[in-house]
Structure formats: C-alpha cells, structure tokens
Amino acid sequence: MTTRRGRRALLIAGGVGLLALAAALVLNALRSNLVFFFSPTQVHAHEAPSSGSFRVGGLVRAGSVERAADGLTLRFVVTDTVREVPVAYTGLLPALFREGKGVVVAGTMGADGVFRATEVLAKHNENYMPPQAADALRQAGALPSATLQTEAR
C-alpha cells in the first residue's frame, strides 16, 4: 500500500513539474514575441527600448518620402505632429501607404537614430487609424480628421 501511494505521489509530482515546465516555456516564447507600440514623442523621451523590436506609429510627414534607385529601399519620417522619427525600410509597401496618412512601422532603432523598419502597416480606409496611433495623436493634440475611427478595444 505504501509503495502504491508513493508511486502515485511521485507520478503526480512529475506531472505537476512537467506542466510547470511547459507553462514556463510557453510564457517565455510569448514574452520574446511581444512588440510594444510607441509614439515618436515617446521614442524621443527614451521610453522605447534601446535594443529589441518595437512599433512606432503616427503620420507619414508630407514631403519626407525618398526612394532609392533600387525601387525597394525607402526613407521617410513618422510624426505625431510633436516629434519625428526617421525610418528606413527595404521591401514592398502596402498599397495604401501615402504621405500625410497613418502608418505603424515595426523594427528596431539604429545607433544613428534611424528606425530600421522590418514591417510597414498602413491604415486600410479613409477614416481608420490604429487605436494606439490615434491615442498618440490625441495626446499630441492633433488628429488628421474629425471622423477618425478606431477598432473597438
């Protein structure tokens, strides 16, 4: 009876240990895949991580888009109307990418102060902007239009 009870306790303890290990691995994987959002003002205030990926959102400043000769490399400026972040991106842009329109870029900040984007997301209709970008523009006191819509949170 004691050996049977001992084996059962050992089996339960092993199962709990394996569950704890699996949970720790899943949480670690999720934490390493998190990408936080920051406005250009927050980036300049050093609230964004100095290393690692994050997102910057705002408006593409009018007149800031410069294309390289290869047709894929692009430089532009993301602004929240208070501060600006220069961005470099190599790749195909979304069809809705335009100067003066909302954009969210994901990537890392270079030592030279240029944000190296690995992904560019443009707003998908005339009155839409990602909620984080809209909040950042509201805090800056400038919204692109009075009819701005955001996703339900």
Curated annotation (Swiss-Prot):
<comment type="function">
    <text>Heme chaperone required for the biogenesis of c-type cytochromes. Transiently binds heme delivered by CcmC and transfers the heme to apo-cytochromes in a process facilitated by CcmF and CcmH.</text>
</comment>
<feature type="topological domain" description="Cytoplasmic">
    <location>
        <begin position="1"/>
        <end position="8"/>
    </location>
</feature>
<keyword id="KW-0479">Metal-binding</keyword>
<feature type="transmembrane region" description="Helical; Signal-anchor for type II membrane protein">
    <location>
        <begin position="9"/>
        <end position="29"/>
    </location>
</feature>
<keyword id="KW-0349">Heme</keyword>
<dbReference type="GO" id="GO:0020037">
    <property type="term" value="F:heme binding"/>
</dbReference>
<dbReference type="GO" id="GO:0046872">
    <property type="term" value="F:metal ion binding"/>
</dbReference>
<keyword id="KW-0201">Cytochrome c-type biogenesis</keyword>
<feature type="binding site" description="axial binding residue">
    <location>
        <position position="128"/>
    </location>
    <ligand>
        <name>heme</name>
    </ligand>
</feature>
<dbReference type="InterPro" id="IPR036127">
    <property type="entry name" value="CcmE-like_sf"/>
</dbReference>
<feature type="binding site" description="covalent">
    <location>
        <position position="124"/>
    </location>
    <ligand>
        <name>heme</name>
    </ligand>
</feature>
<dbReference type="InterPro" id="IPR004329">
    <property type="entry name" value="CcmE"/>
</dbReference>
<dbReference type="Pfam" id="PF03100">
    <property type="entry name" value="CcmE"/>
</dbReference>
<keyword id="KW-0472">Membrane</keyword>
<protein>
    <recommendedName>
        <fullName>Cytochrome c-type biogenesis protein CcmE</fullName>
    </recommendedName>
</protein>
<keyword id="KW-0735">Signal-anchor</keyword>
<keyword id="KW-0997">Cell inner membrane</keyword>
<keyword id="KW-0408">Iron</keyword>
<keyword id="KW-1133">Transmembrane helix</keyword>
<comment type="similarity">
    <text>Belongs to the CcmE/CycJ family.</text>
</comment>
<dbReference type="GO" id="GO:0017004">
    <property type="term" value="P:cytochrome complex assembly"/>
</dbReference>
<keyword id="KW-1003">Cell membrane</keyword>
<feature type="topological domain" description="Periplasmic">
    <location>
        <begin position="30"/>
        <end position="153"/>
    </location>
</feature>
<dbReference type="InterPro" id="IPR012340">
    <property type="entry name" value="NA-bd_OB-fold"/>
</dbReference>
<keyword id="KW-0812">Transmembrane</keyword>
<dbReference type="GO" id="GO:0005886">
    <property type="term" value="C:plasma membrane"/>
</dbReference>
